[in-house]
Every structure is written in structure tokens, then in C-alpha cells.
């Protein structure tokens, strides 16, 4: 592409893929494609091993961009999403805390990656040269981050969002214990159901009343079910995901919540899935990775704390 645009001639290329199950031979994958397209151009392999003094001088060097692995989570205006699912136009959070559209996406195979792990943020597998913003305000390569403090950016405060504190408490409770069901034959209509432990019913009913809602209560063997038939509530809750594994909080909502609203949402969630331990403080669980990190942002806004997010596999 660069050669065509500038009218230049390709002298050499450097493409290397360390052996793996998918590419046991370093000449496969992207290197094989280059060999097919440019059969007369030598591939110098691993750039770190090139003897630059023996190579012909060039006027223009074109390089690829550092990458993340496909499952890396990125905060979009709709919530955390795997980077492999993002498209041109998707609004993502920048290092300045602003939502900006993606102008171009790139997919390529890469070899070596390093793991970047920071409290309260998704773990990231990145190429060693990928830049990260650190506490000093400078950018540092991923491979040099040992012991550094990475800056976690919260979105700029958005436009004020509607809803009383009691309403946002119910949103938190929905994220913990709720699900949506469609009404057959009726578009954008449905029912929201909360499953509440029998010893937790009255505090939930108090919040429902304060929010101006009505719930139909039915008793099951181990819990109560609260059914809400208001279609506007159903449509609003669908935004947060229908079932446990799909739950998330859109980024624009995290940005627009006031401190009090964020506290109410967090309190509602903890009332359902939380557990207070005198030694460690509050803990909560979810099967949704995206929701876990979104709640960490809400907690940071509500209580000025940085959460630890841990993965725990159930015993076999």
C-alpha cells in the first residue's frame, strides 16, 4: 500500500511469527502472504536480530502498529467490549477521558506479548512496545511497566441523567438479581423480574415504593419474585443486558451518573450480590467480566476507591 501511494520500491520486509500451535513454522501466516505477494523481496525475519549495517539504505520505513490480543476489553460508550468486536465509528474512551469514534481497525497476527495487570482494570495482553499512560503523565512501553502506576481514566462528566436515587438503587438490584422477558406479539414490551431472598424482601419493597413503582409479588420455594410490567422500565433495563452473563453498564451512563446516583446503583447491587467482610470490606460476584469492571468504575466514582477484580473458578 505504501509503495503504491508513494511510487517507491520495496527493498526488504521484516515479518516474524514465533512457532505456535497455529503457526509451527515462522514462514507461515503473514510471512507466507508477503512471500506470495512479493516473491523477490527478502524477508529479514525477527527485527531484533537484523544486522542493520549489512542492509541497503532506505528512504522510507513503514511499520505496523502495536496490538492487543483479540479478547482485550475496551471501554466503549455502550460498555466494555472485546477489542475484536469493535468497528469503525464505535465510540471509545480516550486518554483524555473523552468519547471519540474509531477511524480504522486492524487485525493481524503477532508473536510475543506481555501481560499488563493493574488494580481495577482489565488485564491486557499487549505487544511489548505498546504505550501506556503512567502516573507521571508520560507514555511508557508495556515491557517497561514493572512497578509503574498506570493511570485509569474515568470518562468526563456527561449530561445529567434522569432518575431518583431510589430508581438507580433498583437498577443496581436489577444488575444483581433481575432479568427481562419479552411479551409475545408486542414490540418493545415486556416484563422485568427480580428474584429476592426471603429475608431481603422488605428493603427491596421500600425502594420500589420510593421509586414510584409497583411490583407483583409471588412466593416461590426459596425466594420471592417481584414482577414489573411497566414497558418503560422493561426498555430501560434491557440496556443493561437481559441475563446474568450479558449484564453491563453502558459507558455513557457511567459518565453521566452523579456521585449520589453512582452510590445508589452500587448499593443496590451490593444489597443483592454483595457480602461485607470486616477484614476486606465489600465483595461482590458476577459471571459477567464486563459488568465487574464497569462496577469498579462506578465504585471509583461513588466512593473514591479502586477495586480489586479477581477471577475465581468454582470447584470441580
Regions found by a protein language model. Give the residues of each.
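Protein maturation boundaries and topogenic segments
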Residues: 67-88
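Conserved active-site and SAM-binding loop architecture
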Residues: 1-67
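Surface-exposed loop/turn positions
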Residues: 72, 87-90, 130, 149
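NTP-handling and nucleic-acid-processing catalytic cores
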Residues: 83, 88-89, 102-104, 113
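Intein-associated homing endonuclease modules of the LAGLIDADG/DOD-type, together
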Residues: 95, 105-315
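A short beta-strand micro-motif
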Residues: 72-77, 92, 114-118
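Catalytic palm active-site di-aspartate
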Residues: 15-18, 89, 268, 281-282
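Short coil-to-beta-strand transition motifs
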Residues: 93-101
Amino acid at each position: 500500500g505504501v509503495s503504491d501511494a508513494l511510487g517507491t520500491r520495496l527493498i526488504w520486509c521484516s515479518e516474524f511469527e514465533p512457532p505456535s500451535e497455529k503457526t509451527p513454522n515462522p514462514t507461515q501466516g503473514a510471512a507466507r502472504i508477503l512471500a506470495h505477494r512479493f516473491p523477490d523481496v527478502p524477508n529479514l525475519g525477527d527485527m531484533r536480530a537484523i544486522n542493520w549495517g549489512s542492509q541497503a539504505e532506505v528512504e522510507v520505513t513503514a511499520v505496523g502498529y502495536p496490538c492487543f490480543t483479540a479478547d482485550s476489553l475496551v471501554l466503549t460508550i455502550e460498555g466494555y467490549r472485546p477489542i475484536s468486536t469493535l468497528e469503525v465509528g464505535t465510540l471509545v474512551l480516550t486518554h483524555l477521558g473523552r468519547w471519540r469514534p474509531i477511524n480504522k481497525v486492524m487485525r493481524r497476527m503477532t508473536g510475543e506479548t506481555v501481560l499488563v495487570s493493574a488494580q481495577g482494570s482489565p488485564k491486557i495482553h499487549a505487544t511489548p512496545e505498546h504505550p501506556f499512560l503512567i502516573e507521571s503523565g508520560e507514555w511508557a512501553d508495556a515491557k517497561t511497566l514493572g512497578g509503574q502506576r498506570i493511570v485509569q481514566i474515568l470518562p468526563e462528566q456527561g449530561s445529567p441523567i434522569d432518575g431518583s436515587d431510589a430508581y438507580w438503587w433498583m437498577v443496581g438490584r436489577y444488575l444483581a438479581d433481575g432479568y427481562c422477558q419479552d411479551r409475545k406479539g408486542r414490540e418493545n414490551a415486556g416484563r422485568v423480574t427480580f428474584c429476592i431472598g426471603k429475608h431481603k424482601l422488605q428493603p427491596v419493597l421500600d425502594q420500589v415504593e420510593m421509586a414510584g413503582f409497583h411490583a407483583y409479588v409471588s412466593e416461590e420455594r426459596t425466594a420471592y419474585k417481584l414482577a414489573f410490567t411497566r414497558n418503560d422500565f422493561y426498555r430501560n433495563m434491557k440496556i443493561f443486558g437481559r441475563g446474568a452473563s450479558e449484564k453491563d453498564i453502558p459507558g455513557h451512563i457511567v459518565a453521566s451518573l452523579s456521585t449520589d446516583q453512582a452510590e445508589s446503583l452500587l448499593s443496590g447491587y451490593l444489597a443483592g450480590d454483595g457480602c461485607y467482610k470486616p477484614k476486606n470490606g465489600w465483595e461482590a460476584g458476577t459471571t459477567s467480566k464486563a459488568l465487574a469492571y464497569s462496577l469498579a468504575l462506578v465504585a471509583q466514582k461513588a466512593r473514591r476507591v479502586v477495586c480489586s477484580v479477581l477471577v475465581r473458578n468454582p470447584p470441580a
